[in-house]
């Protein structure tokens, strides 16, 4: 059996296609899996430090990190995306792209509807009731990357499964650009998908 996969060079258009045959797969997979879990230790400690700082100092620490990492001046007054910002985003996004997003929403919803689980109960002659109760979470948070990785699909694939499952409130966090704005297509996708609150953080 043969499999194929490819590597894309970041920042360029060079793509190397690798044929994964029985003869080559062990060597190729070994090289791909060489990265040791221990190599992530420095990142884990950095993340732990950030979490502790935010837990200790709250929003002020979050605003400081947003300034350091995203170069954006975010505070309590502008961290939540407003309806005016969403309306502006619609004016900046090509109507054809908005239509594509809407069609994608229909397709993604249809797929996840087929995965949906339902409550069921069964009564036995002796009065015993067996069953399963499926209850959606009341609230979930989703993270959507920004910058060069700002894809509307990231919004849809995070939000729509939760909506189909019956989640009542969806809160989205996404990093702003240095002007404190969120990528317009991200905002349009979030609005179309049914996100309730969007925070400029991440």
Question: Which ranges hold each PLM region?
Answer:
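Short, basic, glycine/proline-bearing loop/turn elements
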Residues: 28-30, 144, 192-196
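A glycine-rich helix N-cap at a beta->alpha junction
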Residues: 186-202
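Conserved small-residue-rich beta-alpha loop and adjacent elements
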Residues: 122-188
């Amino acid at each position: 059996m043969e499999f194929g996969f490819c590597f894309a060079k970041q920042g360029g258009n060079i793509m190397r296609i690798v044929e994964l045959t029985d003869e080559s797969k062990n060597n190729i997979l070994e090289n791909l899996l060489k990265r040791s879990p221990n190599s992530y230790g420095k990142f884990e400690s950095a993340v732990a430090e950030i979490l502790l700082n935010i837990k200790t100092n709250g929003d002020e620490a979050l605003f400081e990190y947003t300034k350091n990492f995203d170069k954006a001046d975010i505070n309590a007054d502008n961290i939540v995306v407003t309806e005016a910002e969403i309306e502006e985003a619609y004016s900046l996004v090509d109507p054809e792209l908005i239509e594509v997003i809407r069609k994608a929403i229909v397709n993604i919803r249809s797929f996840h509807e087929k995965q949906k689980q339902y409550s069921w109960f069964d009564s036995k002659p002796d009065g015993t009731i067996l069953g399963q109760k499926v209850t959606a979470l009341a609230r979930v948070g989703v993270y959507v990357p920004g910058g060069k990785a700002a894809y509307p699909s990231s919004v849809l694939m995070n939000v729509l499964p939760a909506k189909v499952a019956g989640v009542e409130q969806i809160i989205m966090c996404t990093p702003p650009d240095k002007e404190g704005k969120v990528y317009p297509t991200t905002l349009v996708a979030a609005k179309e998908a049914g996100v309730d609150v969007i925070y400029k953080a991440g």
